[in-house]
Amino acid sequence: MGVIQTLDGLMNNPTPEGRVDDILRPEGDNPLLEKGFVTTSVDALLNWARTGSMWPMTFGLACCAVEMMHAGAARLDLDRYGVVFRPSPRQSDVMIVAGTLVNKMAPALRKVYDQMPDPKWVISMGSCANGGGYYHYSYSVVRGCDRVVPVDVYVPGCPPTAEALVYGILQLQKKIWRTQTIAR
């Protein structure tokens, strides 16, 4: 059944036979789908929009930040994934923590996280951000940024390559796609 036939059928019969309850039926029994209507949930629509427009707040603390800049450069070009780096936490929905988090910087990290609008996600990039890394036994290092902010995706490596960060961003997009946004 083509679009023209569907429009022609609607013009001849302006009141469709389907009711609101027809949306809840399985796809095979749904008369709205047979007439050419597409139904979706608000969750799926919002998650689709969020996966295509992730705006990360960069929180580069050490050498991993260089790889994060490399991922945004021309060779990998995160713009084609809808990732645009933002300088302000109020404009971003993703925070990339890249590098060694020390005790003095932990309150600043939490403050930036609290300033981000909901829903918000965090990517922990590198061994130092994941668990302290090389400086794990130092008295001044936080042993993982997940002790300060909730982390959604961990990117391993010392430093992780830019390709690993892109893979982590793609994994976060998959996680956002599966999230129930309204119930979150």
Curated annotation (Swiss-Prot):
EC numbers: 7.1.1.-
Binding site for [4Fe-4S] cluster: 63-64, 128, 158
InterPro entries named in the record: NADH_UbQ_OxRdtase-like_20kDa (IPR006137), NADH_UQ_OxRdtase_20Kd_su (IPR006138)
Keyword Translocase (UniProt): yes
Topology versus the membrane: Peripheral membrane protein
GO CC terms: plasma membrane; respiratory chain complex I
Pfam family, one: Oxidored_q6
Gene Ontology molecular functions: 4 iron, 4 sulfur cluster binding; iron ion binding; NADH dehydrogenase (ubiquinone) activity; NADH:ubiquinone reductase (non-electrogenic) activity; quinone binding
Compartments where located: Cell membrane
Cofactor: record remark: Binds 1 [4Fe-4S] cluster.
Key words of the record: 4Fe-4S, Cell membrane, Iron, Iron-sulfur, Membrane, Metal-binding, NAD, Quinone, Translocase, Transport, Ubiquinone
Any Gene Ontology biological process: aerobic respiration
KW Thylakoid (keyword) present: no
Required co-factors: [4Fe-4S] cluster
Signal sequence range: none
Catalytic activity: a quinone + NADH + 5 H(+)(in) = a quinol + NAD(+) + 4 H(+)(out)
Chief location: membrane
Record-stated family: Belongs to the complex I 20 kDa subunit family.
Quaternary context: NDH-1 is composed of 14 different subunits. Subunits NuoB, C, D, E, F, and G constitute the peripheral sector of the complex.
NCBIfam families in the record: nuoB_fam, PRK06411.1
Function (record text): NDH-1 shuttles electrons from NADH, via FMN and iron-sulfur (Fe-S) centers, to quinones in the respiratory chain. Couples the redox reaction to proton translocation (for every two electrons transferred, four hydrogen ions are translocated across the cytoplasmic membrane), and thus conserves the redox energy in a proton gradient.
Protein name (Swiss-Prot/TrEMBL): NADH-quinone oxidoreductase subunit B
